[in-house]
Amino acid sequence: MALLLPLAVLLAACRPGHGFSGGCDTCGLRPVAYHYGGMRVVGGTEALHGSWPWIVSIQNPRFAGTGHMCGGSLITPQWVLSAAHCFGRPNYILQSRVVIGANDLTQLGQEVEVRSIRRAILHEYFNNKTMINDIALLELDRPVHCSYYIQLACVPDPSLRVSELTDCYVSGWGHMGMRSAAPTQTAEVLQEAKVHLLDLNLCNSSHWYDGVLHSHNLCAGYPQGGIDTCQGDSGGPLMCRDSSADYFWLVGVTSWGRGCGRAFRPGIYTSTQHFYNWILLQVRAAAHPTSRTWSHYMSTSSYHHGPNAVPTQPSVSDSCPFPAQKLREFFTGVQNLLQSLWGSKA
């Protein structure tokens, strides 16, 4: 039995519960970055390539330099989750492209995939003044291929206790300086920083955000400031490690803040858990007749039978560092062997 337990743990690590993944067999895993090193986002450090393999750069030629406009997270091979306020102008959508698997936006390697946007779905009740319902879905013109540098993010369903997650990070290519007036340099290399989830009531108190936050918001950063998301990080991920396994949940979408890195003004995020059903509804409604049904990509807390998703590519791009099918076969073989040995002793 001691031999079976580690195998069961590996199987569980290849398909987390409490949420959904969009194919490629798994979500929330970082094949290249098993050991997270030192923790620019404001006050952060450069991320190693592959550290956050679901983050994407949404680019528009109207923006200087690399054209980076906003971030986003790949949640299925053909859908990206981002912030609605990034797409206030229709021509931004038509002219934009999505870069997946990149780290340095000035040097896109062979592992990077680039897609056009087929459609953008902004929340129907998004308000760009109050920033309520600041969430959007982007359908890519064709699916991407999972690899060591391209993975899917896990969106938590309502059963996950997000407030109990303590190991959380933000990442993006946004401005890196603390902003009082004009923003400073935009990052070319992906930046990352560790943050704390802060109590929403505290963030909404009179000396902080003074009641302007909504129940679907998350608040993350540090009371003293210094580390924060900034302009250009919008739409990107707020990610927390699962409390019992080495995979990450996409718990928030970067929405807004007052300044960058200021005391008592932490970053404000849209809770993905709050909009879980909205996300499912939109992607189901947009499903193409030739595509897999959305239920193919679902995994909830009631899921008990192991992964049923089929990788979109051969094993060279299998997204799970421990291929689930092989593990199940090995696990079954060991179990049969032990049963045979026990039977011979009887």
Swiss-Prot record:
Q: One GO cellular component from the entry?
A: extracellular space
Q: Where is the Peptidase S1 domain?
A: 41-284
Superkingdom of source: Eukaryota
Q: Which GO terms describe its biological process?
A: acrosome reaction; proteolysis
What are the alphabetically sorted keywords of the record? Disulfide bond, Glycoprotein, Hydrolase, Protease, Serine protease, Signal, Zymogen
**Where is carbohydrate linked to this protein?**
N128, N204
Q: Name one GO molecular function term.
A: serine-type endopeptidase activity
A Pfam family cross-referenced in the UniProt record is Trypsin
Which residues get removed as pro-piece? 266-346
In its miscellaneous comment, the UniProt entry states: On the 2D-gel the determined pI of this protein is: 6.4.
Q: Kindly give the PANTHER family that the UniProt entry links to this protein.
A: ACROSIN, ACROSIN-RELATED
What protein does this entry describe? Answer: Acrosin
Tell me what organism the protein belongs to. Meleagris gallopavo
What gene is this protein a product of? ACR
